[in-house]
């Protein structure tokens, strides 16, 4: 109900519904794509945790990076570009824990750091980081003889 309400709020505020927006069943929402939701809509300011993709139109790369860096959340970002130099410069400027180039933010390997920034969370997950953070090392020295 929460995600459905956020979709409705965005559409009422001027977002265009490209696809979805309804329910597949009483418990499953359709994958939804919103075009240009208003900046003040909750779907633009908070992590959705639902099958929703919000797409925004920008004037230029500086505008896109400023908008992304102004968000309260900063888990992962994606940059799609034909020019790898442009993509890498954008990745360097984005304040996100991970930046995928020409790949969606669903990419993850077990050994990569898995972290949030700002309101997306603190600390780092992933197998190596979790083992380090969830265990205590102890050294035992045994003198023989």
Which residues are covered by each model-predicted region?
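Short secondary-structure junctions
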Residues: 12-23
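Helical element adjacent to the flavin cofactor pocket in flavoenzyme catalytic cores
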Residues: 6-11
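Conserved C-terminal structural/oligomerization subdomain of aldehyde/semialdehyde dehydrogenase
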Residues: 12, 28-145
